[in-house]
Amino acid sequence: MEENPVKENNLTYITNEKNKTNELIKKGNFEEAEKGYKEIINFINNLKKEELTDDILNQKKLILSNLSHALTKLNRIKEAKKFDIEIIRNLDKKFSKSYARLINAYLEEKNVACARYHYSLMKEYCSKEDIQKFPEVINKIDHEIQEKDQFIQGIEAMKQIFLNK
């Protein structure tokens, strides 16, 4: 069965535009990259449901991830997190890069509880091989979890001391 030429043209257009916009990222032009990625996402969002192939949805995931990266570089972390959450919720719950970016963002905000939550989801849905691609993030969250656990143990020990007096 032949591929629908409209769908093939959409995929080609999306891929070409993504590649052009990726070049802006490589040059450090994050503002223009943001605009480019948002235009492509807008194009995809305006496609009819029957035009949304798995390949187009995969491109959407990658474009949203790249958009999140650009926004992170622009120090717009809160906005960047929304796109990573959209990827995990709506496109690919096994996309380890989004979990890693979210964990890192929450740790930067000193929100260890949210970082820990996304780390648990990452461990649930992603392969060990995928998780190992982000050693710095994993070391950081493991360290934060260990510190929090030690802090809680210290409080519990203090409670016991005061309760026994």
Model-assigned labels for residue ranges:
Residues M1-L47, E144, D149-K165:
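N-terminal alpha-helical interaction modules that lie
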